[in-house]
Amino acid sequence: MLLFVFAREAKFMDKDALPVNQILLDGFTCKKPVYRTTPNGREIADVLLAVNRSYGISDYIPCICWGRNARYMGTCGTGTHIILQGRIQSREYNKKVGDQVEKKIAYEVSAYWVEDKKE
């Protein structure tokens, strides 16, 4: 899978600067976020965010929220307008296909800041 990013602005970093993996999304929940607790007791919410582009096109970005952000997203319904800040991450998982198990890679945004954008 290829991940393409359109940037409105790019800056050259100082050679001593640490790498930055940061993304800001402004969009709408496509479906009710799924809130749950992991076996380790961590709170998590799966969110599918529609980020609108011009010409009536939207990008659908899978996001995960943790802790208080997960609890908050669990109260949101479909169509909630939110601003979300986080980092892009990838993770491996196994998918059973018939008798076989295939290794897959998922790309998602792990959010560390979420805000309801009141109109």
Label each region the model flagged.
Residues 2-119:
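Single-stranded nucleic acid-binding surfaces, predominantly the OB-fold ssDNA-binding core
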